[in-house]
């Protein structure tokens, strides 16, 4: 598929896995989410960038998608701040295009699955296609170390949580601290012995990009802390915990990315509307002893939460911090704190 479009960002050529989000807002939060490393992000909404940009919407200190595609990218200031989104993307050096037939592109990805693609302001079609065909797939790639930040602390009271940063959003860090926990952030690749040497009351595993099965160092670290302190994971962290517990993951046809995904809790049947951003899912065709599925997607029946009560471990596939989005699952940060201090 070849789509004509108009450049409104930085010039250049960008390659990656083509994905789409159905979120109507939160465009600045989306492009600063490290989970989009290695991907070209398409917004399905007819217009983005219609309320400006501001530092309060940043989930990290940089833009992570290789390129941004939209039908229309606004450039007016707004309630978020005085700088328009189009100008902000250009200043960040991001390849961004508009006037693309995003409806056609999204339907193609929906019908044929995630695939490699590229955006270029400088190459011809055949040159770009040749580069796309040579570009590596995300499968088998551990991107957690590249997406992780440095060591840092947040919060000065409450139980101490060691958060393993695989590409953690600022909103998740704020959610942990806001629930009354002192958070010590360490990068992906930190060993179990190094984590336990910090004397944590609990361990958290963050979201992030790449193939969870390839994140062997984090999986090994989790295996070394399970049963010693309470463990909680979100998104990629949910998938990595699942691997440490003996489950496996598989690639979804086109992923879950949006702010209106219904998830049902097994314990009481309550449905939560959730924010999601993932391209892999946990496979629960053979549950190890002591592991249970706690939440399920009402869109496709995929696993959205697991727990191993005897090992003090639990995780969810979706984002309870929801920046922006519904806060149906915000209680999960407090629930983790309650488990830690119990």
Where are the regions that the model predicts?
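Active-site-proximal beta-strand elements of phosphoester/diester hydrolases
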Residues: 160-165, 274-275, 314-318
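Catalytic beta-strand/loop cores that center a nucleophilic Ser/Cys/Thr
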Residues: 269-311
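Phosphate-coordination loops involved in phosphoryl transfer and adenosine-cofactor binding
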Residues: 157-160, 228, 290
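RNA-binding accessory domains that recognize and position tRNA/RNA substrates
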Residues: 1-189, 193, 197-198, 212, ...
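Cysteine-nucleophile active-site neighborhood
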Residues: 197, 201-202, 207-281, 325-340
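Proline-centered loop/turn at the N-terminus of a beta-strand
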Residues: 95, 160, 230-232, 248, ...
